[in-house]
């Protein structure tokens, strides 16, 4: 049908453009909120819990959590492919890190567990080892063998006299004798 001076197609295009503008505004508002929350978290100063025991200090906040992972790990930040800015890769937890001081920075390689309960390692660093840890842009890339691991955890680090830093960790492989049991590992 048509309205004098207008075509249905033109009206439909105008509505689609209005919807795209509304979605873009929603996307930008949500992204700004996520960025603000992330910036507040990673810049937050940790606080000593007083009175302590006189030997070491405990701190109020954990140095790394799932919320410390970069937003671009968790979200597709492209409004064309993720207009509602939905989380695409859920992080369940960040924990059990190996740590070392290297080049005047405190470096941790943490176990990062996805919502699928599978883990990978990622490096984060801080100037003081107490707060302001930031993950490097990319997780650790692990070489695969002919018998691939399904999970990795419990990394520990040591600087060797040869100048390299070595990480020793545990890994799991699928127990092929139990193909229907997704929890079976060796």
Regions found by a protein language model. Give the residues of each.
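Beta-rich carbohydrate-recognition and catalytic domains
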Residues: 3-96, 100-150, 158-186
């Amino acid at each position: 049908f048509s309205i004098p001076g207008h075509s249905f197609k033109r009206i439909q295009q105008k509505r689609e453009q209005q919807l795209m503008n509304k979605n873009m505004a929603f996307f930008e508002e949500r992204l700004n909120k996520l960025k603000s929350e992330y910036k507040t978290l990673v810049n937050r100063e940790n606080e000593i819990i007083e009175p302590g025991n006189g030997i070491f200090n405990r701190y109020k906040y954990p140095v790394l959590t799932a919320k410390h992972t970069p937003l671009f790990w968790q979200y597709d930040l492209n409004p064309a492919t993720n207009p509602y800015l939905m989380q695409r890769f859920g992080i369940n937890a960040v924990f059990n890190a190996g740590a070392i001081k290297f080049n005047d920075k405190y470096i941790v390689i943490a176990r990062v567990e996805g919502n699928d309960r599978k883990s990978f390692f990622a490096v984060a660093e801080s100037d003081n080892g107490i707060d302001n840890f930031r993950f490097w842009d990319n997780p650790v890339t692990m070489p695969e063998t002919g018998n691939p691991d399904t999970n990795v955890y419990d990394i520990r680090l040591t600087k060797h006299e040869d100048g390299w830093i070595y990480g020793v960790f545990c890994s799991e492989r699928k127990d092929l004798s139990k193909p229907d049991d997704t929890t079976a590992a060796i």
